[in-house]
Regions:
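Conserved AMP-binding A3 loop
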Residues: 45-49, 187-211
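Conserved AMP-binding/adenylation subdomain of ANL enzymes
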Residues: 210-227, 235-277, 290-292
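Conserved AMP-binding/adenylate-forming core of the ANL superfamily
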Residues: 33-80, 84-88, 105-110, 164-165
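Conserved ATP/PPi-binding loop(s) of AMP-dependent carboxylate-activating enzymes
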Residues: 372-412, 450
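Conserved pre-ATP/AMP-binding loop-to-beta segment of ANL
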Residues: 33, 146, 161, 168-191, ...
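Gly/Ser/Thr-rich phosphate-binding loop
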Residues: 164, 275-280, 289-352, 359, ...
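Structural core segment of the AMP-binding/adenylate-forming
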Residues: 64-65, 92-168, 488-491
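AMP-binding/adenylate-forming catalytic core of the ANL superfamily
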Residues: 104, 111, 121-123, 278, ...
């Protein structure tokens, strides 16, 4: 059919104007005097107008030093005002915002610097030692190195400029970008959590950021009246895009900065700033719940708590609904595709333990596992909540289907727009998915496949268990025996109790029962709160 309008004119306008920055600037115009960002530690509030001016100062200062749309600005920043200034400033320049996981080693950071070759590097003073270590071993040294500190009082080391000095002559006026913006411009480069090897660089373009913001706005839902606080580091996608700077500043809401998480401080901020949405991993929300049970505060402003990073079990879910808010959400996704599966308050607590159902614009399926090739997305496993398959995701609105500078892994993980996640799952007749584990976490014992997450969810049902970690130990007879690390919520818990519990549980087959238990104070998690199924090399059973 012949279009009745000028398609080329529509494309040209849409592709250059439907950008994240234009969304933010609409709020500067409409809500200029409304609060955009609050930093409790410095007792400062930025309105949309003053936040825009601060971002302009950084953008114009970077441009004066030669940063263009061809460049990368990398940063190792805590949740902070400078993080937000950098995020907006890079959109204004048209360059790539590349937030680093500041918990990596100096050697790992050096490799990521050499891969992305940033023109500028911004870091918090807390990371001076690790950044200095990284810079000593890089082949590519950024031309501009900036150190931020919370109170703008510290002096920078040689070869580094303080943030306050770098931006002091920057113009508060909106800078003029030298080239035409496009929704296809890479705007942010995330790095995967690196649970299997060195983090992979994931490019996200402008339209991905806009539609990721829309996804959050639609699913929470989020409005300009909301006040959000993301309890996780903003350097990962769930931090930046789930109730973090990306959607909150796009819709015109207010963000409260939590620089370093403590449960008491988080609850204090909820009460003081009338926060409506919290975002965090189940382990973090569990800490909030325990404090609120013993020392309750007024947290009646909460409209919802969004969990991500690991499965949400039924008993904890019921506690959170009773103690914190009845509106609990749980999201599952990847760095590559943002979140793609969601549990909403009307699903809970009945469907706790599930990852959820697919998000509105996404297609998520469980397909036959084949280690030799990509199976067709149509080769589905039965929807019987028993047959295990691999989760595949089609989310063209939130993905570029690629890794930066890594064609081999791109070919391995993406096929015809589908991401092959490596996550194993079952699903039911309503297409609700339950994550069982990862392909590379699967334990084979006496010829049987055992999925750690499945066993952990059962162990976590014990009233004295706060959290568990299940893995295999090499065994000459069985290949592997099942072992469990337990973080108890009650110090009186014994190995005998756990073995009896496993023996009596109707959903734990004998071959899946842990043979060895050890009790620990902490379990290993990555920066996003996800449980790591890799023990330290010096750990002995």
């Amino acid at each position: 059919m012949q279009p009745s309008y000028n398609v080329e004119r529509f494309k040209e306008t849409f592709e250059s104007e439907y950008t994240y920055l234009n969304g933010f600037m609409r709020n500067v115009f409409r809500r200029g005097n409304e609060p955009a960002l609050i930093c409790p530690l410095t007792n400062r509030t930025w309105t949309y107008r003053t936040l825009n001016e601060e971002a302009n100062r950084l953008a114009s200062s970077l441009m004066a030093r030669g940063v263009t749309s061809d460049d990368v600005v990398m940063h190792a920043l805590l949740n902070s005002a400078e993080f937000v200034f950098t995020y907006i400033a890079t959109h204004k320049i048209g360059c790539v915002n590349a937030p680093l996981n500041y918990r990596l080693s100096g050697g790992e950071i050096a490799l990521l610097i050499d891969q992305s070759k940033p023109k500028a590097l911004i870091y918090d003073a807390e990371f001076e030692k690790i950044i200095s270590e990284a810079l000593r071993s890089v082949h590519h040294r950024p031309e501009i190195i900036i150190m931020a500190d919370l109170n703008n009082e510290m002096d920078a080391p040689e070869g580094v400029v303080t943030y306050r000095d770098f931006v002091k002559d920057g113009s508060p006026e909106n800078p003029v970008r030298k080239d035409k913006p496009s929704i296809y411009d890479e705007t942010t480069r995330f790095f995967t959590s690196g649970t299997t090897n060195l983090p992979k660089a994931v490019p996200v373009n402008d339209i991905n950021e806009v539609l990721s913001a829309h996804d959050v706005i639609m699913h929470f839902p989020l409005s300009p009246k909301d006040v959000t606080m993301n309890l996780t580091p903003w350097f990962h996608r769930g931090g930046l895009h789930s109730g973090g700077p990306c959607p909150t500043l796009y819709i015109g809401g207010t963000m409260v900065i939590l620089r370093d998480f403590t449960p008491r401080l988080a609850l204090q901020y909820v009460s003081l700033y009338h926060i409506t949405f919290l975002i965090g991993a189940p382990t973090v929300i569990d800490m909030l719940c325990r404090i609120q049970e013993t020392n309750p505060r007024d947290i009646s402003s909460l409209h919802g708590i969004v969990l991500m990073g690991s499965p949400l079990d039924k008993e904890p879910c019921k506690r959170y609904m009773k103690v914190l808010t009845p509106n609990i959400f749980n999201g599952y996704g990847t760095t590559e595709t943002f979140w793609n599966v969601f549990l909403r308050p009307y699903d809970l607590p009945d469907k706790a333990g599930y990852a959820g159902g697919a998000c509105t614009d996404d297609d998520v399926r469980v397909v036959r596992v084949d280690t030799t090739k990509h199976v067709s997305p149509d080769e589905l496993v039965p929807m019987d909540k028993e047959t295990v398959g691999e989760v595949v995701i089609f989310a063209p609105n939130k993905s570029t289907f690629a890794y930066y500078d890594n064609p081999k892994t791109t070919e391995e993980k993406f096929h015809n727009g589908w991401l092959y996640t490596g996550d194993l799952a079952t699903w039911d007749e309503h297409a609700y998915i339950t994550i069982i584990g990862r392909k590379d976490d699967m334990i084979v014992s006496a010829g049987e496949n055992i999925y750690p997450v499945q066993v952990e969810s059962i162990l976590n049902e014990h009233p004295k268990v706060a959290e568990s970690l299940v893995f295999g130990i090499p065994d000459p007879k069985r290949g592997s025996v099942i072992a469990a690390l337990i973080r108890p919520s009650d110090p009186s818990l014994t190995e005998k109790e756990m073995k009896q519990f496993c023996m009596n549980h109707p959903m734990l087959a004998p071959y899946k029962r842990p043979r060895i238990f050890r009790f620990v104070k902490e379990l290993p998690h990555n920066a996003t709160g996800k449980l790591l199924h890799k023990l330290p090399p010096d750990f002995k059973f």
